[in-house]
């Protein structure tokens, strides 16, 4: 009697699974694609499990659109296994934004394929990958010339309403890039040295009286962790661009945040001031003008 009940229960489970599978397979294909792509965008592990549900899902999960939306956060940035590398390559061919950023970063800094790397980074930045915007923007600024202004414009897209929030996010980007760097770079990386050499410091309009440090805790605007990457003029220049362009377009809230600037008599020591103090007069007046034009 017990054996009979067990067999009956097992048979019922198999039938219910078969019925569920048949119901899913009967859904329109475009709906299956949307389900698969949304699942993949949230978790790579989840889409792997989805492939086991039915033959239809296994086939749909191989669609280019699903690969385009896949989240790659569960995969190491520089995959050493051949299967993982092939998987990333397939994602790149599907124009997956995260894969494009990885490909561009590796091409530019490790493989020394700068032109191709910049193309991938540009596409990833255009598709909304913030880390790609950060790296691509800084590279363009370093290269100078006509690309410099474009670099500032790209970096301005990651700026938040509050300056302190912006600094925190830039710090986060910096450490993310630094972590990637430790994965495959070495101390005498020639590409980074070329970027440092290529950057031409231009005297900003405030004569560097505004020595804004975009990274808090007395740490300057370092490109890849080296204190000599960029000098104060570039930090000042970027700060001027942020406060003369972005806020006037946004017009949502007052400029706020901690401002670090160089002491006049002790240039190697940095002090925290109240917002808008220690600034060149023209910049300070511009900020006052803006803050009066908006309501908090």
Curated annotation (Swiss-Prot):
InterPro entries for this protein: At1g67623-like, At2g35280_TPR_dom, F-box-like_dom_sf, F-box_dom
Every F-box domain range: 21-70
Matching Pfam families: F-box (PF00646), TPR_27 (PF23310)
Protein name stated in the entry: Putative F-box protein At1g67623
Taxonomic lineage: Eukaryota, Viridiplantae, Streptophyta, Embryophyta, Tracheophyta
């Amino acid at each position: 009697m017990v054996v009979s009940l067990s067999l009956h229960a097992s048979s019922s489970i198999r039938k219910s699974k078969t019925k569920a599978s048949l119901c899913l397979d009967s859904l329109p294909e475009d709906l299956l694609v949307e389900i698969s792509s949304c699942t993949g965008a949230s978790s790579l592990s989840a889409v792997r499990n989805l492939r086991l549900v039915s033959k239809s899902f296994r086939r749909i999960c191989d669609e280019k659109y699903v690969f385009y939306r896949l989240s790659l956060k569960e995969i190491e940035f520089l995959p050493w296994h051949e299967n993982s590398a092939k998987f990333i390559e397939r994602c790149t061919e599907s124009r997956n934004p995260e894969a494009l950023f990885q490909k561009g970063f590796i091409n530019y800094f490790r493989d020394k394929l700068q032109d191709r790397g910049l193309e991938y980074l540009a596409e990833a930045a255009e598709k909304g990958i913030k880390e790609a915007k950060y790296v691509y923007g800084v590279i363009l600024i370093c290269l100078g010339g006509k690309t410099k202004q474009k670099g500032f414009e790209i970096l301005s897209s990651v700026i938040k309403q509050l300056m302190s929030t912006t600094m925190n996010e830039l710090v986060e980007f910096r450490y993310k890039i630094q972590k990637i760097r430790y994965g495959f770079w070495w101390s005498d990386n020639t590409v980074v040295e070329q970027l440092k050499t290529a950057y031409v410091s231009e005297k900003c309009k405030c004569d560097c009286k505004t020595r804004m440090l975009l990274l808090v805790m007395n740490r300057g605007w370092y490109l890849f962790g080296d204190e000599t990457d960029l000098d104060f003029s570039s930090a000042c220049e970027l700060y001027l661009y942020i406060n003369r362009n972005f806020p006037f377009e946004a017009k949502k809230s007052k400029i706020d945040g901690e401002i670090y600037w160089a002491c006049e008599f002790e240039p190697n020591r940095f002090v925290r001031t109240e917002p808008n103090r220690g600034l060149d007069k023209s910049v300070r007046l511009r900020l006052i003008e803006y803050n009066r034009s908006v309501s908090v």
